[in-house]
Each structure stands twice: as structure tokens, then as C-alpha cells.
A protein has these predicted regions:
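Bacterial N-terminal signal peptides that target proteins for export
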Residues: 1-10
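Generic cytosolic/nucleocytoplasmic N-terminal low-complexity/intrinsically disordered segments
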Residues: 3, 20, 37, 47, ...
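Bacterial N-terminal signal peptides
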Residues: 9-21
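Acidic, Ser/Thr/Pro-rich low-complexity intrinsically disordered segments
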Residues: 25-28, 35-37, 55-184
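N-terminal leader/pro-regions and domain N-caps
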Residues: 28-49
Length: 184
């Protein structure tokens, strides 16, 4: 019996079944959020239910341009994932608010084709990617709160919006409220 050739086959099958990513805590859950025209949908979440990503390199790729690698520390905690639909001729604002104002959260989201869901580490390109996190320095005329917001705009096509709420500086615990406001 020839066992030598079995290992490459097993590795190939594991790669096909698991995908290209193996998350530290297993495959993540992606929570569906039903956005409603001209309303705000609110969902509760917790970083405890999230996973740490092996790599943040996808975010700084020029085809994604989500956030620069100099800001990676703000996304090193657990990530909790959400997905919603963005219909044509609409603007969506997504805001995360920590239950405890001292919890340092970050948010990112990307706009992709309406018929797919792509996890962050598998993202090779997107229509647009937005992120918000704690500022390194004050901005003239602006005051930052613990809330973080991102915004998307659809002109003639519908899109899928993938949202990630992340703990900053390795944070793995913290409850939050996610608000999805859709204007048509």
C-alpha cells in the first residue's frame, strides 16, 4: 500500500474544505442585519463572540485601501462580523457604540458584489472600504466620542456591505450596539 501520496491529497482536501484561512478560534459567524429604507436598524454584539484575524495585510492592499498598516494596532483584538444589503440609490451609515464608553472599538466595512460574502482575509478587491478608529491626534474643530462610523453610497447598483467591529490593542471583551441607517 502506498501511503506516501496520501498526505498531499489530505492537505488539498483540507484546503478546499476550510478555505485559505484558518482563524485562531475556528470559522467566524457572520451576522445578517436586515436594513430597512429610511430607518435605523439596531443590533447588539460582543467582542467575546468574535475571532482574531491571523493577518491584517488585506486591509492595506491598494485594491482594498481600508486602513494603512500603521493603524493595525487598532484592529488587533477580536473581530465580530455583520453583513447587510445596500440597494441602489441609497446611502448607508454604520455606527458602533460601546456599552462602556472606555471600550476602544474600531469599525471597518467594505462594499462588494451583492451575491457573495467574502471574509476579510480572503478579500482581494472591493468597490470601496471604509474604516474608523480612535484618532492618534486631535483634529481641529472636531471632538471624537467612543462611537465610530462609516458610510457607503450606491448609485445605480445594489451591493453587499460586510462590516467588521474590532477591538483595539488586542481587546477581546466589550459589548456594543451596531446601528445601520439606510437612506433612500
Amino acid at each position: 500500500m502506498r501511503r506516501k501520496g496520501l498526505l498531499p491529497l489530505v492537505v488539498l482536501l483540507m484546503t478546499v474544505c476550510l478555505g485559505s484561512n484558518v482563524f485562531a478560534q475556528g470559522q467566524p459567524t457572520v451576522h445578517a442585519v436586515q436594513s430597512v429604507a429610511n430607518q435605523t436598524t439596531t443590533v447588539e454584539g460582543s467582542l467575546k463572540d468574535g475571532v482574531k484575524l491571523k493577518s491584517l495585510a488585506w486591509a492595506a492592499m491598494s485594491s482594498n485601501a481600508c486602513f494603512p498598516a500603521t493603524q493595525n494596532a487598532k484592529f488587533t483584538g477580536n473581530h465580530v462580523f455583520f453583513v447587510t444589503d445596500l440597494p441602489p440609490h441609497s446611502i448607508m451609515t454604520v455606527t458602533v457604540k460601546p456599552k462602556n464608553g472606555s471600550t476602544d472599538l474600531s469599525i471597518y466595512g467594505y462594499q462588494i458584489a451583492p451575491n457573495i460574502v467574502v471574509l476579510p482575509e480572503d478579500l482581494r478587491s472591493c468597490v470601496t472600504c471604509e474604516a474608523d478608529h480612535k484618532w492618534d491626534y486631535p483634529k481641529r474643530g472636531q471632538t471624537q466620542t467612543s462611537a465610530r462610523s462609516i458610510r457607503f453610497n450606491a448609485i445605480g447598483n445594489s451591493y453587499k456591505i460586510f462590516i467588521g467591529v474590532a477591538g483595539a490593542n488586542g481587546l477581546t471583551e466589550g459589548d456594543f450596539t451596531l446601528e445601520v441607517t439606510l437612506k433612500q
